[in-house]
Amino acid sequence: MNADKPYFAIGFPNMAGGYEVRNRYFKGCVAPKEISHIRQQGEPRNMCYLFEGFMDYLPFLTIRIKNNPQYPRLTTQDYIILNSVSNLAKVESLLTNYTQIGSFLDNDTAGRNAYETLKAKFGERLLDKSLYYRDYKDLNDYLCGKPLSQSAEPIKQEKQVQSARRMMQPPKKRGLKM
């Protein structure tokens, strides 16, 4: 809390005990930074869906449930969330266990480069699911109805890891400087 004002954010756990943390003003993590791997119970799955961030994974779940509320098929595959394209090398060994990999990466330079890197390694096993939202930066923009031409500039991170204390501080107001 800062000046007796509470702040909140949604946190998404990763494999190293850290959290990806988001709110309207903040995008960061509570260290350590790592991927998130969601494995289904029971028999190992042949399919894995790969997302750049959890703000792409959550819209995927929403779209699946909205399109088919009776049978959204959420447990027929595992999920890997990179939490940053810089974590791409960390998922390659995990992805070798799957016969099919659905790639829901962003339609920007970083997302396309990551896709091409994976395509070189996994070939036809990698399926480009970003074609479903090709006129949008990512699945979240698709769900919100914000085409690429209307999409806000992505948040630029100078640091991958920010402290939880810094997360609790609201952003500084910035006005027009002349």
What are these regions (language model features)?
Residues 64-178:
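TOPRIM fold recognition
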